[in-house]
Amino acid sequence: MRVTVFHNSIPASITAAQKLTKLLKSGHFELDERHPEVVVTIGGDGTLLSAFHRYADQLNSIRFIGVHTGHLGFYTDWRDFEIEDLVIALKEDSGQSVSYPLLDVQATYADATSAHYLALNESTLKRLNGTMRTEVYIKGDFFESFRGDGLCVSTPTGSTAYSKSNGGAVIHPRLDALQMTEIASINNRVFRTLSSPIITAPDEWVTLEPTGRDDYVMTVDQFVINPPTIKQIRYKIAKERIHFARYRHMHFWDRVEDAFIGAKH
């Protein structure tokens, strides 16, 4: 099995990565940073997001495993004191995995160029100064004219991240749906939006067409993109999926409870 270890720079992660690398070598695993079959991330959810984007062009052949060295991570199933148990699980691996939907982001600019991105959690559109104005279409049909600070489009797993902070619903990842939430929308007698999260069907897509300004900022997960003048952004569920090696089974709602409520501890 080809394995690589991807870690952040905090001391606990570096120590855990060194220990894991040593055990992998003694266990006769092939360490392959370029074309791994399994990517073990050590850190937190941010580290896993970075690894996802690092290997976004190899998603069909890679499974991810998350080890957290700080606070509990939503994508991480292992703690740094369980490194030996993780290596045993890798040795007994039979290919078991679980997959989650991803967000396909297609941006078209006023100069006729375009860019394509994949997001594990979410993508947002905001304006640097003043009120953002954008037309919103669902499956090609006009839905509303939005005015406010911004819009957030998320995956089911991303529904527990920034989208939740915007009042979005938590969506089970078995649903191939995307969710759009508003960021401080303007609502009065003149300007009206739905003022509610929108959850779309698997065959639907959301299109944003911002109007009149070139100071918009787009984010894709943790990355901030300052593009040229945006003509259109189209969001849909991607054909690609992210795969996690699943040696332990933790129900999604148990994971949500553990991350946000913690009443069982």
Curated annotation (Swiss-Prot):
<keyword id="KW-0963">Cytoplasm</keyword>
<dbReference type="GO" id="GO:0019674">
    <property type="term" value="P:NAD metabolic process"/>
</dbReference>
<keyword id="KW-0520">NAD</keyword>
<dbReference type="InterPro" id="IPR017438">
    <property type="entry name" value="ATP-NAD_kinase_N"/>
</dbReference>
<feature type="binding site">
    <location>
        <begin position="45"/>
        <end position="46"/>
    </location>
    <ligand>
        <name>NAD(+)</name>
    </ligand>
</feature>
<dbReference type="InterPro" id="IPR002504">
    <property type="entry name" value="NADK"/>
</dbReference>
<keyword id="KW-0067">ATP-binding</keyword>
<dbReference type="GO" id="GO:0005737">
    <property type="term" value="C:cytoplasm"/>
</dbReference>
<dbReference type="InterPro" id="IPR016064">
    <property type="entry name" value="NAD/diacylglycerol_kinase_sf"/>
</dbReference>
<keyword id="KW-0808">Transferase</keyword>
<keyword id="KW-0547">Nucleotide-binding</keyword>
<dbReference type="InterPro" id="IPR017437">
    <property type="entry name" value="ATP-NAD_kinase_PpnK-typ_C"/>
</dbReference>
<dbReference type="GO" id="GO:0006741">
    <property type="term" value="P:NADP biosynthetic process"/>
</dbReference>
<keyword id="KW-0521">NADP</keyword>
<feature type="binding site">
    <location>
        <position position="149"/>
    </location>
    <ligand>
        <name>NAD(+)</name>
    </ligand>
</feature>
<dbReference type="GO" id="GO:0003951">
    <property type="term" value="F:NAD+ kinase activity"/>
</dbReference>
<feature type="binding site">
    <location>
        <begin position="121"/>
        <end position="122"/>
    </location>
    <ligand>
        <name>NAD(+)</name>
    </ligand>
</feature>
<keyword id="KW-0418">Kinase</keyword>
<dbReference type="Pfam" id="PF20143">
    <property type="entry name" value="NAD_kinase_C"/>
</dbReference>
<dbReference type="GO" id="GO:0005524">
    <property type="term" value="F:ATP binding"/>
</dbReference>
<feature type="active site" description="Proton acceptor">
    <location>
        <position position="45"/>
    </location>
</feature>
<dbReference type="Pfam" id="PF01513">
    <property type="entry name" value="NAD_kinase"/>
</dbReference>
<comment type="similarity">
    <text>Belongs to the NAD kinase family.</text>
</comment>
<feature type="binding site">
    <location>
        <begin position="160"/>
        <end position="165"/>
    </location>
    <ligand>
        <name>NAD(+)</name>
    </ligand>
</feature>
<feature type="binding site">
    <location>
        <position position="222"/>
    </location>
    <ligand>
        <name>NAD(+)</name>
    </ligand>
</feature>
<feature type="binding site">
    <location>
        <position position="184"/>
    </location>
    <ligand>
        <name>NAD(+)</name>
    </ligand>
</feature>
<protein>
    <recommendedName>
        <fullName>NAD kinase</fullName>
        <ecNumber>2.7.1.23</ecNumber>
    </recommendedName>
</protein>
<comment type="function">
    <text>Involved in the regulation of the intracellular balance of NAD and NADP, and is a key enzyme in the biosynthesis of NADP. Catalyzes specifically the phosphorylation on 2'-hydroxyl of the adenosine moiety of NAD to yield NADP.</text>
</comment>
<dbReference type="GO" id="GO:0051287">
    <property type="term" value="F:NAD binding"/>
</dbReference>
<dbReference type="GO" id="GO:0046872">
    <property type="term" value="F:metal ion binding"/>
</dbReference>
<feature type="binding site">
    <location>
        <position position="147"/>
    </location>
    <ligand>
        <name>NAD(+)</name>
    </ligand>
</feature>
